[in-house]
Amino acid sequence: MFIKKNDKVKVIAGKDKGKEGTVEKVFPAQDRVIVKGINIVKKHQKPTNANPNGGIVEVEAPIHVSNVMLIDPSNNEATRVGFKVVDGKKVRVSKKSGEIL
């Protein structure tokens, strides 16, 4: 997967199209990511010891990795990601600028 935790991404499809945020969690098996402040859903929470009242809480739901693009730190634009071997290590490379991410 080409998206990692703490990457800055832009949503390119869905109800939050055009919004930007940082990746909080990655689920490689499901090809999904959780982005801070994006894809907020309301979850009905049962009463527990920690939250005795329960109620409706807003949480970030996972979004499919195909619906986000990595933001290139050099020019702050959404870019596709490629891979290159540098000094025997595989690194991510911006397709737009050619910079190592």
Swiss-Prot record:
<dbReference type="GO" id="GO:0003735">
    <property type="term" value="F:structural constituent of ribosome"/>
</dbReference>
<comment type="subunit">
    <text>Part of the 50S ribosomal subunit.</text>
</comment>
<dbReference type="InterPro" id="IPR003256">
    <property type="entry name" value="Ribosomal_uL24"/>
</dbReference>
<dbReference type="InterPro" id="IPR041988">
    <property type="entry name" value="Ribosomal_uL24_KOW"/>
</dbReference>
<comment type="function">
    <text>One of two assembly initiator proteins, it binds directly to the 5'-end of the 23S rRNA, where it nucleates assembly of the 50S subunit.</text>
</comment>
<keyword id="KW-0694">RNA-binding</keyword>
<protein>
    <recommendedName>
        <fullName>Large ribosomal subunit protein uL24</fullName>
    </recommendedName>
</protein>
<dbReference type="InterPro" id="IPR014722">
    <property type="entry name" value="Rib_uL2_dom2"/>
</dbReference>
<dbReference type="GO" id="GO:1990904">
    <property type="term" value="C:ribonucleoprotein complex"/>
</dbReference>
<keyword id="KW-0689">Ribosomal protein</keyword>
<dbReference type="GO" id="GO:0006412">
    <property type="term" value="P:translation"/>
</dbReference>
<dbReference type="GO" id="GO:0005840">
    <property type="term" value="C:ribosome"/>
</dbReference>
<dbReference type="InterPro" id="IPR008991">
    <property type="entry name" value="Translation_prot_SH3-like_sf"/>
</dbReference>
<comment type="function">
    <text>One of the proteins that surrounds the polypeptide exit tunnel on the outside of the subunit.</text>
</comment>
<keyword id="KW-0699">rRNA-binding</keyword>
<dbReference type="InterPro" id="IPR005824">
    <property type="entry name" value="KOW"/>
</dbReference>
<dbReference type="Pfam" id="PF00467">
    <property type="entry name" value="KOW"/>
</dbReference>
<dbReference type="Pfam" id="PF17136">
    <property type="entry name" value="ribosomal_L24"/>
</dbReference>
<dbReference type="InterPro" id="IPR005825">
    <property type="entry name" value="Ribosomal_uL24_CS"/>
</dbReference>
<dbReference type="GO" id="GO:0019843">
    <property type="term" value="F:rRNA binding"/>
</dbReference>
<keyword id="KW-0687">Ribonucleoprotein</keyword>
<comment type="similarity">
    <text>Belongs to the universal ribosomal protein uL24 family.</text>
</comment>
